[in-house]
Amino acid sequence: MSTGQSDCLALVPPDESWAAAVWDYRAEFEAVGDVLAGTADLGAAANFTGWLAGLRADARPDTVRPGRVSADTFLAVRRSDRRLVGMVNIRHALNDYLFRFGGHIGYSVRPTERRKGYAKEMLRLALNKCKGLKLDRVLVTCDSKNEASVRTIRANGGALENRVPEEDGFTDRYWIEVGR
């Protein structure tokens, strides 16, 4: 990170107080035509309240929405100014799709905050959360052409298992030993 500090971010559960910041985050991605990864379908949400209700449902095994797995979504907030710089979605288990393409952790950094080391720190913080979920090994995937994500995953201990073909390219599948 540009500050040289490894503790400049906090992973914060979203609540109503973050509505404007989350919608601004979404708008920044839409303005540049970028994909909102690791946001639990924020791009498809009609409004913040509905998106937040879905997150809360997915956080509990007894209320998770059909076709999904239990997951927690966090806002990556810069401590110095409380700016939302990224989002992380941590899946507690893998279904067939997540095993092949999505992995346990998805994340994104807002376009104006990239190339500052935030993704690396976000993934490190997410891996610490995985310890609390008793996950020993975590699957993290990325588009094989996304060199920044490849570097981020490798910097956090990712070991490439394989490359899976998709319609528009390949997905690289990395395993990270988390330990407990």
Task: Walk through the language-model features, giving the residues of each.
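Conserved GNAT acetyl-CoA-binding A-motif
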Residues: 130-141
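Conserved G/P- and acidic residue-centered "switch" motifs that form tight phosphate/ATP-binding loops
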Residues: 82, 117, 146
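GNAT-family acyltransferases
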Residues: 1-104, 111, 129, 167-180
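Mobile, glycine-rich extracellular loop/lid and propeptide segments
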Residues: 88, 114, 143
